């Protein structure tokens, strides 16, 4: 039996307190299950933003999507996680990744390191967080017995780490290029990544939830025309190839609903995250899927 859908929205733009809370309430009204905050310079600090979101809402879970592990000391992060889980009444979901924007580390005066070094640091962070948050001696204590852990992954070592530790396996649907740019994965490439993850996770007692970050959502009767402004950003792919990317949902409402169902069947993606600019346009998709 397929896992039920969950839907998250990543709120990226800063706003005064009243506007931020109103935006969070709107996400709840639209049916989103998770309100998420990123971890990039120039965007709101994730933990206070999530506490404010909790004060403004009742139902949604609240998560980081995803923390840049290179910004965080594990002991200090454990304190933030436990405090935020307490202040949100146990609604926190912790998302972690290696980070992919070198310029942010340079601006913050933090070491960047090689890809392997960043994965090593993330592994140490995950293991130390688990040790601290599972200890009865750690103060403060989180409300949840285990704060659900999401790890954003694509490379082999990251998928192994995700298989070993994460409650939610988040697929970006893209590979990182030098300089911090992202190159989308075709469906066949994503098949291979998901298959490797499943192989690595074969011994798990409980299967993880699989997440996909959807980058583009456009409801339209003319997908070819609608996708034109995006093509210069993905010059190595044809129009049809872009429209077939798993992270792109462009078409009529019926088309998108069926595409979401088909991708759950094919890849196992039951938890979809959209970006803030797509919050309103994706809401009818949520409503239609909930009707079924």
Describe the predicted segments one by one.
Residues 1-292:
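Active-site-adjacent structural elements that line small-molecule/cofactor binding pockets in enzymes
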